[in-house]
């Protein structure tokens, strides 16, 4: 056993460089018929994140076995790693957060609650929202299971805020199938735009009207690196995220004097659990393959 314990909170790169962790991880992958090269995009992530990223192919029990192998049969107690809140910026505020069941949306909800907010958490995953409410406490989280592609969902989400809406984080989004434009079907185009653009527009339309009545608020839209370049996804997703940036720019101008602050963030690869359809566009996916090694390592 190494004199320096290693846990599932350490990054995969740290594991590979560790005197006992490296052999333990490589040995596990070899027995599973895999190798470390397949983990290259995730080198910067904690080992434990592989449970979520693998879609169930790697269990927590398997991760624990690797940790024990690297630590002489024991699982060391990990140091507490939690981001400290910077205060109570959201005390008395009500925030709506879409895509709150996992990934960026869930992390946003955690931080908002930690800083005193009442959160209206919405997502299509009822199970994910239930676990979020259990984690954060039902007193500060109201969950609304809703599909943003359904126009009726907007009324339900806004009603849950009970009149006061101080902030909106438009995080929810879905991926396309990497299809180039000559491969894009009407179904894929409509599905991506209904959630990423039309759903965002409908909810923001309702929320901004409420904010105008109440004297202001703050809206943050989550786009993607696909809003900055054409080599991150297929045509439908890329176009949808460019649209999100366009909506944000328009709102920033329209409401600058009305007390509504609007911003957009364009994250790179993040372990969000966003599903990628299996029916990938052959031409587009082949083109994207050559660009993937240039994408910065995934983060959480």
List the model feature ranges, each with a label.
Residues 115-131:
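Conserved glycine-rich Rossmann-like NAD(P)H-binding loop of the short-chain dehydrogenase/reductase
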Residues 175-190, 213, 233-236, 276:
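Conserved mid-core segment of classical short-chain dehydrogenase/reductases
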Residues 182-201, 216, 220, 244:
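Catalytic Tyr-X3-Lys loop
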Residues 204, 240, 248:
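Active-site helix of classical SDR
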Residues 209, 253-254:
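Alpha-helical segment proximal to the catalytic Tyr-Lys
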Residues 224:
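Residue(s) in the substrate-gating loop at a strand-loop-helix junction
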């Amino acid at each position: 056993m190494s004199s320096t314990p290693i846990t599932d909170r350490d990054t995969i790169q740290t594991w590979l460089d560790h005197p006992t962790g490296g052999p333990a991880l490589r040995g596990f992958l070899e027995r599973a018929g895999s190798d470390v090269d397949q983990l290259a995009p995730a080198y910067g992530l904690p080992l434990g994140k592989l449970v979520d990223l693998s879609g169930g192919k790697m269990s927590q029990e398997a991760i624990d076995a690797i940790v024990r192998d690297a630590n002489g049969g024991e699982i060391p107690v990990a140091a507490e790693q939690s981001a400290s809140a910077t205060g109570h910026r959201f005390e008395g505020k009500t925030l709506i957060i879409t895509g709150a069941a996992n990934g960026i949306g869930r992390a946003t909800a955690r931080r908002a609650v930690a800083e005193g907010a009442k959160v209206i958490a919405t997502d299509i995953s009822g199970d994910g929202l239930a676990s979020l409410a259990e984690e954060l406490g039902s007193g500060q989280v109201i969950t609304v299971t809703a599909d943003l592609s359904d126009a009726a969902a907007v009324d339900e989400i806004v009603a849950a805020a009970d009149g006061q809406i101080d902030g909106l984080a438009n995080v929810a989004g879905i991926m396309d199938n990497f299809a180039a434009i000559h491969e894009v079907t009407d179904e894929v185009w409509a599905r991506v735009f209904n959630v990423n653009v039309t759903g965002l527009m409908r909810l923001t339309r309702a929320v901004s009207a409420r904010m105008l009545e109440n004297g202001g608020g703050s809206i943050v839209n989550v786009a993607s690196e696909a809003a900055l370049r054409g080599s991150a996804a297929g045509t439908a997703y890329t176009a949808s995220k460019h649209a999100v940036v366009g909506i944000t720019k328009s709102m920033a101008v329209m409401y600058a004097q009305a007390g509504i602050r609007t911003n957009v963030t364009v994250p790179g690869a993040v372990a969000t659990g966003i599903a990628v359809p299996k029916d990938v566009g052959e031409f587009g996916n082949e083109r994207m393959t050559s660009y993937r090694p240039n994408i910065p390592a995934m983060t959480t």
